[in-house]
């Protein structure tokens, strides 16, 4: 049955009620009710987020001790950096989250040793509170040597080595293109004994970074042509490593 639109006075009353109930979100509901879309396609295409991030997470097939989980963190960070290189991105911040297994509290021996904070997972089971930390890099980079080193330092600093680990999440924050990072001006405090010119050490560092970038691109080229397991590192063959197995999966399932 057709109904006439409410009067202007009634519309105002309804709008006031909506804003009282839903706050600023009421504006979206009102626009939707009238079939009005304030955002144009041009605005959607022109949108650029203030911050970007790239990351990966892994739920381990069984509880891992801290030393084995460290190998997985190294593998994940290595792969994350390769993904950045592939898309021409760099980062200056790494965030690491490590989730512990319920066995830390269900096993009487382990539970007796643990005196830290306890929380619950999404299934309502008690687990030790996860470890979480951030590592800031000196500048934007996609150097695996730099990023992996900082991530492992962060891992060693935040985890409890006595607990079993089940989940690992590694995220690269403040991600931007290499061109955007180069445009940004950086400043460094200098003393009277510093020289403005590039030192031999700085030149050597630049050359080392360039060589590493060339090696990373060569690795990507080989992987894209012959498969992800065509070129691996010694770390990937250590006990507890998961990269070789994960490379054969699609969406986390065996291909």
Please place each PLM-identified region on the residue numbering.
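Acidic, metal-coordinating catalytic segment for phosphate/diphosphate chemistry
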Residues: 124-255
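DNA-contacting surface of Y-family translesion DNA polymerases
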Residues: 2-164
């Amino acid at each position: 049955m057709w109904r006439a639109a409410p009067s202007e006075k009634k519309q105002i009353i309804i709008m006031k009620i909506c804003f009282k109930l839903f706050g600023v979100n009421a504006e979206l509901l009102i626009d939707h009710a009238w079939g009005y879309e304030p955002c144009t396609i041009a605005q959607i295409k022109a949108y650029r987020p203030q911050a970007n991030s790239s990351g990966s997470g892994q739920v381990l097939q069984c509880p891992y001790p801290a030393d084995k989980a460290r190998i997985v963190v190294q593998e994940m960070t290595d792969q994350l950096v390769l993904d950045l290189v592939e898309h021409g991105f760099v980062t200056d911040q790494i965030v690491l989250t490590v989730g512990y297994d319920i066995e830390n509290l269900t096993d009487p021996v382990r539970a007796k040793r643990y005196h830290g904070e306890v929380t619950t997972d999404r299934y309502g089971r008690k687990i030790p509170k996860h470890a979480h930390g951030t590592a800031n890099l000196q500048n934007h980079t996609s150097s695996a040597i730099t990023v992996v080193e900082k991530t492992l330092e962060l891992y060693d600093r935040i985890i409890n080595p006595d607990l079993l680990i089940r989940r690992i999440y590694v995220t690269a924050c403040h991600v931007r293109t290499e061109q955007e990072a180069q445009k940004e001006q950086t400043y460094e405090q200098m003393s009277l004994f510093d020289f403005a010119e590039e030192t031999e050490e700085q030149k050597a560092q630049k050359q080392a970074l360039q060589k590493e970038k060339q090696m990373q691109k060569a690795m990507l080229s080989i992987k894209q042509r012959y498969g992800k397991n065509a070129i691996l590192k010694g770390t990937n063959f250590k006990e507890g490593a998961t990269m070789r197995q994960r490379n054969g999966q699609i969406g986390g399932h065996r291909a």
